[in-house]
Amino acid sequence: MADSKPATLSSVAASGFLAASERVKPHTKLIALLALGHFVIDANQGALPAVLPFLKQWHGLTYAQVAMLVLAGNLTSSLIQPLFGYLSDRIARRWVLPVSIVVSGVGVALLGLAPGYAASLALVVVMGLGVASWHPEGYKTASGVAGERKATALSLFSLGGNVGIAVGAPLVTFLVAGFGSQGTLGMLVPTAIVGTLMLAAMPMITRESIPRAGGRARVRGANMPGAMAVLILVVTVRAWATLGFSTFVPFYYVDTLKADPTIVGVLLFVFLGAGALGTVIAGPIADRVGPRPFIRWVLPMSLPFGVLFLLSHGPLAFVALACFGAVLTSSFSVSVLLAQAYLPRNAGMASGLIVGFAIGLGGAGVTALGWVADRWGVPTALWISALMPLVAFAVARFLPPPRDLAAA
């Protein structure tokens, strides 16, 4: 089994994945700023699952309507990302980075003021559009300043997003518990601060997110659309499991176990926060063993923890939930790296297809889980989600090695 060497790959704004003539170090400050922007954009998105039980109570929604809100969020924040990625590959639009942060923040902040289901649905769409426009440009820009250890750098960039998703839930829960439905307006504070910082950094981002290897870089490799299709299917099934848990674990505790609704934020923080930790650990490992072998074998490793969570109670259930989130989510940024290797000429679109389209398809699966929960109960929906990594593993066996990586 040969080691993958993602460190030999670099990217530019207009053309995608590139091989540069010399090794370069990552631009640490810009990666940190982009990770901070990723934190806020995904905190806004991550607040949605925690708001859902409140919206259900305020407006008398059914589980199917709740699942439709999830679907709307994922359709707009995910499925249309390849379009933004395509536009990003053709013409760099760095101004999208600060603008998308503001748009996503406004969408989630006004949810507490929505008069009913239709208005809530519209605001979820607004939030989703901000998220969708951010990710292709953000991942491509981060890749452009990542230097030679791409898996490690992208894992740190992804850490910002994963921590944001984890923090968004308890933050909005705290705001609503303390200030009522108007508490969601508090999400505008981090949005305004980081959006302003991102806007101020635009000149530096534009200057530094070009090849810094000391010479002309050339596009390397041909696209592998068939391999990309297999990877999209793997990520779709993995996203189905992840979104299934983040959506229905709160209802499992509140409606089935009759727990206090304020525990929702803690549950999501445990699950998604552990996922953020798993992403950081995954980067250096994937740099050593290669993205394809890592993705293949990490998926079945998550299965026992999902099952253990559903069979246990108390502290053990929290530990199992954390382990399930950490292992299942660890391949997130590695999947983006492999996607960029499969589509070396379209880095923005590759990011959009994985972070957006594939995860959006997984969100469509959550709608089916909502139908299952309405008819057979929330535990059944969670059991289906817990077994999804086994399906993803079976599909991942068909992932071919990228032509320009020495992956096994």
Residue spans for each PLM region:
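Conserved MFS/SLC helix-loop-helix module at the cytosolic interface between two early adjacent transmembrane helices
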Residues: L79-P115
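Cytoplasmic helix-loop-helix junction between adjacent transmembrane helices
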Residues: L123-G160
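Helix-to-loop junctions at the C-terminal end of transmembrane segments
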Residues: I80-A92, G278-G290, A373-D374
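Residue-level signature of mid-helix packing/kink "hotspots" within the transmembrane helices
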Residues: G46, N74-P82, I165-A166, L272-V280, ...
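Extracytoplasmic gate region of multi-pass secondary transporters
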Residues: L48-P49, G226-L272, A276
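Structural signature of the two symmetry-related core transmembrane helices
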Residues: W95-L110, P293-V307, A386
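Helix-loop-helix hairpin linking two adjacent transmembrane segments in secondary transporters
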Residues: F157-M204
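C-terminal transmembrane helical hairpin of 12-TM major facilitator-type secondary transporters
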Residues: A286-S335
